[in-house]
From Swiss-Prot:
GN (gene name): FPR4
Origin organism lineage: Eukaryota, Fungi, Dikarya, Ascomycota, Saccharomycotina
Span of domain PPIase FKBP-type: 312-398
Acidic residues bias spans: 170-228
Enzyme Commission designation: 5.2.1.8
Subcellular locations according to the entry: Nucleus
UniProt-recorded name of the protein: FK506-binding protein 4
GO MF term set: peptidyl-prolyl cis-trans isomerase activity
UniProt cross-references to PANTHER family, sorted A to Z: 39 KDA FK506-BINDING NUCLEAR PROTEIN, FKBP-TYPE PEPTIDYL-PROLYL CIS-TRANS ISOMERASE FKPA
An example Gene Ontology CC term for this record: chromatin
Residue span of region Disordered: 66-120, 164-232, 245-288
Length: 398
């Protein structure tokens, strides 16, 4: 374990009877958990000790998208046997049909066995405020592992540790193929550098010539005015004295004109810039989507006013619940609002996370992944493993 380099702190709260993923599936880093501690505030009045369980997907289990080579070979052989059977007698066909039925039953039994072995569940630790409040552990979870935690009991268990760099993690430079890089000889590189230098020099020369021409034109205009007045003077001393006066007056006039030109533009541009920044900030706060714990996504449509909802707050909500295909499965848009207390286990986990931080009058869209909604449960109008979208409005807060 000494070879693993800590990168950042890891922390996760596992509330009772809520399947909580150990890490997000798109987090390409190893996690090392070293401490489990209990929250002394109970979720219910039973005050039962909390047991932390780890649920791990079996790595050898075949995903739905993977191909079982043995089954594929059996299917191909079955097709060949069917073709040969066209030439066989009727009695042979009946025997083959019976064999195929038996094979199908065996395959169904194998699939049932595989489903039972898909997940492994183990007990990690049991904690209680009266006997043991915390326990040092040492669990390392690789990025490719599908791991969830589940607490049974009356108390939340907090897990802490570190995101670590594992010696077997793939370095970033290995993600890029050597075939993508072009090989150049020293002569080709020198030639390209010389060509780039020539292009840069030509562009710079062109820019300098344009700037010099503008500068010279401005000087020439000023010199013409001075020359006209100097032509009227005959003595050298008068010319020198008058020249200094003309130059000073001309410079003063230019500075004054520049100040007059810059002042209105500065005030106007500053005012316009402030208005744009204010509008941009408001729009950003209003429409920017945020990804919270467990992949719950919130997007504020309207910012409310007053105190914000927090843990233990009693909130009254209006809402419309939709499936991913847009079908409405539940709503509360009139009559008595829907009341509940935040983070007391009265609603699905995604609602506790998504409603926290809202103020009265606020409107928000909450997108909840299946594990933080109803998971594998099938409810009226809600299929198993459904992602749910709620458009909610906070109408009361206590």
């Amino acid at each position: 374990m000494s070879d693993m380099l800590p990168l950042a702190m890891y922390a996760l709260n596992v509330e009772p009877y809520t399947h909580t993923p150990a890490v997000l599936l798109d987090t390409p880093v190893t996690v090392r958990i070293t401490m489990a501690a209990i929250d002394p505030e109970p979720f219910d009045e039973d005050k039962k000790p909390s047991t932390l369980r780890i649920i791990r997907r079996n790595p050898v289990y075949l995903d739905a998208g993977e191909v079982d080579e043995e089954k594929l070979i059996e299917e191909l052989e079955g097709d060949e046997a069917a073709e040969d059977g066209d030439e066989a007698s009727d009695d042979d066909k009946e025997e083959e049909d019976e064999d195929e039925d038996v094979d199908e039953d065996d395959e169904d039994d194998d699939e049932d066995d595989d489903g039972e072995d898909e997940y492994e569940e183990c007990v990690v630790v049991t904690l209680s405020p009266e006997t043991r409040c915390q326990q040092a552990i040492d669990i390392t979870i690789a990025p490719e592992e599908d791991v969830q935690f589940l607490v049974t009991g009356s108390y939340t268990i907090s897990l802490t540790g570190n995101y670590v760099k594992h010696p077997f993690d793939e370095p970033l430079e290995d993600l890029y193929s050597d075939e993508d890089s072009e090989e150049y000889s020293d002569d080709e590189l020198d030639q390209e550098i010389e060509e780039d230098d020539e292009l840069d020099h030509d562009e710079a020369s062109s820019e300098e010539s344009d700037e010099d021409q503008e500068f010279y034109d401005a000087i020439s205009e000023g010199d013409e005015d001075i020359d006209e007045q100097l032509a009227k003077l005959e003595e050298t001393s008068d010319v020198e004295a008058h020249l200094e006066d003309l130059i000073a007056k001309d410079n003063k006039k230019k500075r004054k004109q520049e100040q007059l030109d810059e002042q209105p533009e500065t005030k106007k541009s500053k005012k316009t810039k402030d208005e744009k920044n204010t509008k941009a900030t408001e729009n950003e706060k209003k429409n920017k989507a945020q990804v919270l714990e467990g992949g719950v996504i919130i997007e504020d449509r309207k910012i409310g006013e007053g105190p914000k909802a927090k843990k233990g707050s009693k909130v009254g909500m209006r809402y419309i619940g939709k499936l991913k295909n847009g079908k409405v499965f539940d709503k509360n848009t009139s009559g008595k609002p829907f009341y509940f207390k935040l983070h007391r286990g009265e609603v699905i986990k995604g609602w506790d996370i998504g409603v926290t931080g809202m103020a009265i009058g606020g409107e928000r869209r909450i997108v909840i992944p299946a594990p933080y909604a109803y998971g594998k449960q099938t409810l009226p109008g809600i299929p198993a493993n459904s992602e749910l979208t709620f458009d909610v409005k906070l109408v009361s807060l206590k």
